[in-house]
Amino acid sequence: MPLSNAQLAQTIDHTLLAPDASDAQIRELCRQAAEHRFYSVCVNSANVPLAARELADTGVLVCAVVGFPLGAGLSATKAFEATAAIAAGAGEIDMVINIGALKSGRADDVKADIDAVHRACGTVPLKVILETGLLTDGEKVRVCEMCRDLGVAFVKTSTGFGHGGATLADVALMRRTVGPTLGVKASGGVRDRAAALAMLEAGATRLGTSSGVAIVSDQAGGGSGY
């Protein structure tokens, strides 16, 4: 059965992660999210307090990114950022893995890094960003298996910051690996309704995009990385 606009909207994390995002742009992001009933807005952690105020009593969650976009910070730093973002009003956390550790064969360190943030989140859902454009298929599977074992809420394809975005093949691989219990978030390059529906068909359950309004309106999306 085709998805209605309302159902499609509830798969969307309406996203603005640009380093120069102004307060006015964050307010507009939140206004759009409330109007279209998106699942959440996804913002940098410094913008969580403003977004939380703007979305109070709307039912739209605030999602904060952690260790973004490189994932190369200390685990303790990522955990602190997650804790602080949640205290400021974030209802979901998207973290970037330690990609360098994975490439160096330090899988235990990668898993410990994810676990540290997962513990800091408590009951708040954690999404783990793989940055699939930098990984081999074997590495993608390895991280998805870690996330499945740790019981995080979602695995997520990409940051959308210059290393390639979501692909149907990656979404399908991630879904096969984590099975039916974890969410899969496709992010990076999902800019129109056809792309959104294709990602959902491939196994995604959430979409990270700056083109949410265009997607639910069936228009051409914007040109940002998200």
Swiss-Prot record:
It comes from the Bacteria. Keywords: Cytoplasm, Lyase, Schiff base. Pathway: Carbohydrate degradation; 2-deoxy-D-ribose 1-phosphate degradation; D-glyceraldehyde 3-phosphate and acetaldehyde from 2-deoxy-alpha-D-ribose 1-phosphate: step 2/2. InterPro entries: Aldolase_TIM, DeoC, DeoC/FbaB/LacD_aldolase, DeoC_typeI. Disulfide bonds: none annotated. Coiled coil: none annotated. This is Deoxyribose-phosphate aldolase. It comes from Burkholderia cenocepacia (strain ATCC BAA-245 / DSM 16553 / LMG 16656 / NCTC 13227 / J2315 / CF5610) (Burkholderia cepacia (strain J2315)).
